[in-house]
């Protein structure tokens, strides 16, 4: 990819991920460039000057070199769940943002030695009928040694199995998305499951389980992908044998108090639990419809009693702080990844390096000369190289 194409690709994606029009970008840059010029940059017909490139970098809070660096991965969206009224502009913004975030995660994986996504079970579970989702959910639980107990943290479990959980600010019409980052020979490097910020914990958990279904299921022709993914998600959160044991194999009635207890137990909404009972033929179709009308009348579709707190991702913060502590990325890069100011002490290596650079030039030369003499003596004596792990060597 040429410099022009790389800049064009990066610029357009950044603009769309921020939901900016060309006019809005011109305004945010203080009108140092015209809308027509920006359009040419995005089409690869012209390159911005160094001054304009630096202004773009300041506007988007990235380094200028970001625009010149070729993407190491491309992102494919293998599951996109949205309302029909979601505009193309909103869809482009969401996809651009997810692409940007997932590329950053892949880079962070690489620099910290985190396993890539070659081993992920992408489309590994083939189903030909809706009931096969029960088997697929059970197989995945077995492969991941999860047992049959309810999953206490969906986010933590997914991150333990190298699947990124990404929360974004999105309009109400957005439900979720599943994406895979692949390298130049289409080997998977990472997967991401995306949900909206600000949703309840039970909705977040089912949304993640639903998107996990899009990721791992190979759905046969003629099957409704959304229904299959939903059934898989419910089966993954509430395995059939556990539901039969704790709720029963046949129920003519069930109390709302019971459902609220099971809501906490399985981390699922009352509405999703009632549907689960119907799918497992524990309740009749008539009784299922009765509960759906009751949920509508109580307005529980909008807000249920006993809402669970949304789960929080730990991988990004933990890994970004590790990379910062090891001197692999700067404070500004950490803040860009986390989207917030960093309130931690500077790593000792950075403090030492800055203290060293403040010394007079002659003093720095003396220290470096002494270190060079020590190394020369070390090698001439045939010392074991493992000894280099000890001692106070100053980076410069």
Predicted region positions:
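Short linear interaction segments
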Residues: 364-396
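Intrinsically disordered, low-complexity regions enriched in small/polar residues
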Residues: 43, 68-69, 82, 358, ...
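Short, charge-rich, low-complexity interaction segments located
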Residues: 73-76, 346-370
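Active-site hotspot residues in diverse enzymes, especially metal/ion-binding acidic/histidine motifs
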Residues: 1-348
């Amino acid at each position: 990819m040429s410099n022009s194409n790389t800049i064009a690709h990066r610029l357009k994606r950044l603009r769309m991920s921020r939901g900016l029009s060309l006019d809005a970008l011109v305004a945010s840059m203080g009108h140092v460039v015209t809308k027509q010029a920006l359009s040419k940059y995005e089409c690869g017909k012209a390159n911005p000057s160094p001054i304009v490139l630096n202004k773009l970098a300041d506007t988007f809070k990235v380094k200028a070199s970001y625009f010149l660096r070729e993407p190491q991965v491309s992102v494919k969206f293998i599951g996109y769940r949205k309302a029909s009224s979601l505009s193309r502009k909103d869809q482009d913004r969401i996809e651009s943002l997810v692409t940007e975030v997932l590329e950053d995660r892949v880079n962070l994986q690489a620099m910290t030695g985190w396993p890539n996504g070659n081993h992920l079970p992408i489309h590994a579970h083939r189903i030909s009928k809706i009931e096969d989702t029960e088997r697929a959910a059970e197989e995945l639980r077995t492969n991941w040694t999860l047992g049959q107990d309810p999953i206490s943290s969906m986010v933590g479990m997914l991150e333990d199995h190298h699947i990124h959980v990404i929360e974004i600010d999105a309009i109400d019409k957005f439900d979720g998305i599943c994406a895979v980052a692949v390298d130049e020979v289409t080997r998977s490097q990472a997967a991401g499951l995306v949900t909206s910020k600000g949703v309840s914990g039970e909705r977040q958990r089912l949304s993640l389980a639903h998107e996990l279904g899009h990721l791992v299921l190979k759905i046969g022709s003629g099957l409704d992908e959304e229904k299959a993914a939903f059934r898989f998600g419910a089966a993954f959160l509430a395995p059939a044998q556990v539901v039969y044991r704790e709720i029963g194999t046949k129920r003519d009635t069930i109390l709302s108090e019971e459902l609220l207890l099971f809501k906490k137990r399985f981390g699922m909404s009352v509405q999703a639990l009632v549907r689960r009972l119907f799918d497992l033929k524990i309740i009749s179709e008539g009784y299922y419809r009765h509960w759906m009308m009751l949920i509508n009348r109580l307005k529980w579709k909008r807000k249920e009693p006993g809402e669970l707190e949304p789960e929080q991702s730990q991988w990004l913060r933990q890994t970004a702080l590790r990379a910062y502590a090891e001197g692999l990325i700067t404070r500004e890069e950490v803040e860009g990844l986390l989207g917030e100011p960093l309130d931690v002490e500077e790593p000792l290596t950075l403090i030492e390096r800055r203290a060293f650079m403040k010394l007079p030039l002659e003093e720095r030369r003396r220290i470096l000369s002494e270190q060079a003499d020590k190394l020369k003596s070390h090698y001439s004596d045939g010392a074991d190289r493992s000894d280099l792990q000890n001692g106070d060597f100053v980076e410069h």
